[in-house]
Amino acid sequence: MNLQMIQAHIQQRLQPHFSADEIKAFGFWILPHCEDLPENDRMRALEMICEQLKQQIPIQYIFETAFFGPLTLKVTPATLIPRPETEELCHLISQKNKSIESSNGPIIEGLDIGTGSGCIPIYLLHHNPQWKFTAVDVSEDALDVAAENAFHVGVHDRIQLNQSNFLEWESLPHNIDLLVSNPPYIELKEAKDMADNVLKHEPHLALFTPKNDPLIF
């Protein structure tokens, strides 16, 4: 079973639901997975993946994998799938790190609010070996994923993960040099216009702003 065979099969099964470009991209995800399976199990696995895709389950959740810059991170339905815009933000911050002033010399103390998979602080720690981060989230399940990602990337000794609701804080820690966040900002009234793969499968806690206030954070 090669890439062309996989693409032909998923095109037949998914053509009414996805564009040609999407089907082609799915093939590059699925091929390595199928190649690692015994021949007799490959078609069964392919059928299972196609059924999940037809249910609009994001392929990142099917494989519990998201690519974020040079990093391969774990994602689950407890965490938002990292967006390209977030990657661009991380790249911009990392490029401008020389202009960030710190009271600790070259050591930057960062804080990420609503860390989810941990993609933002882990990316920044990966690119800036002298930085340290505290990352908070209200979701214990999301923090478990972030901990796995930090260990996998090798930055676990420079990140502290805390379960906390930022909206209940009275003030920010005094030793923070850099504050980053990608908080929920979508109002519930916008849900009707959202794609099923987002609305039905990504965590509403990370999508919809509390009290329908996009500026609450």
Regions found by a protein language model. Give the residues of each.
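Proline-centered helix-kink/hinge sites
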Residues: 58, 82, 183-184, 203
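Soluble or luminal CAZymes and related metallo-dependent hydrolases
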Residues: 2, 6, 41, 54, ...
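Conserved SAM/SAH cofactor-binding pocket of Class I
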Residues: 88-193
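Conserved AdoMet
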Residues: 25-96
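Mobile active-site "lid"/loop adjacent to the S-adenosyl-L-methionine
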Residues: 184-216
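Non-catalytic nucleic-acid substrate-recognition regions in nucleic-acid-modifying enzymes
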Residues: 1-24
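Proline-centered flexible-loop/turn and helix-kink motifs
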Residues: 16-19, 129, 155, 203
